[in-house]
Amino acid sequence: LAFIKGNYTFSNASTFNPYSIHIQIEKGEEHIKANVILNYNHHLNKKKRLAVRGYFGFVKTNNNIYDIQMSAWNGSNDYMFSEKTLVRDNKNINYIAYNQQLLIKEGGLKHNTNDSLNSNNILFTISTEYNLTNRFRLYAEAGINGEDYAYGSGLRIPLLRNMLNIYLPIYTEDGIMKFDESYQDKIRFSIKLNL
């Protein structure tokens, strides 16, 4: 498999209200993708911030492995093997559910969505995050693929200076989460290691 990928980033890293714009194009034998990602961090006061991520993507493909994902990626979505993941398939040899580690890619919704919400054409998502306390961040997000939509909200718990993040979904397009034994399968996490 051969891929060509190009990107351009413009960022304003000012102390107050920094933002960045990322433009990416990806071409493979069976697909072409293009997207624009906007990240904006609005300072409400000295301690409170509202972070916003907007995503607009386009894909042209007949192979659903290259569809734009509504949810954040897991290891099995990384078809270019460019990300660090604990598990890349669903064999579960590490006793970690393969879909619980997330990579904020494409749509980036923190809860797992049905594959029917992925797109082989266009996808738009927006997510916001507010720092409630030093330990808890409240997030809300929504996305549309041109026909159907998904949305959700929950808590993010940053640990170890944001190297480990735990995502606890509370509400999604399917309603309020059931906090029973099955809830542990809905919890997602991300790991950021600079090796």
Model regions and ranges:
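C-terminal outer-membrane beta-barrel translocator/porin domains of Gram-negative envelope proteins
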Residues: L1-N131
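Membrane-embedded beta-strand positions of outer-membrane beta-barrel proteins
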Residues: Y19-I23, V52-G54, F136-A140, L164-L168
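Conserved C-terminal beta-signal and adjacent last beta-strands/turns
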Residues: F124-E129, A142, G154-P158
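Active/binding-pocket-proximal capping segment
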Residues: L138-G146, L155, Y171-D174
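Outer-membrane beta-barrel "beta-signal"
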Residues: L155-M163, I170, S182-L195
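Short proline/glycine-enriched turn/loop segments at secondary-structure junctions
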Residues: M177-E181
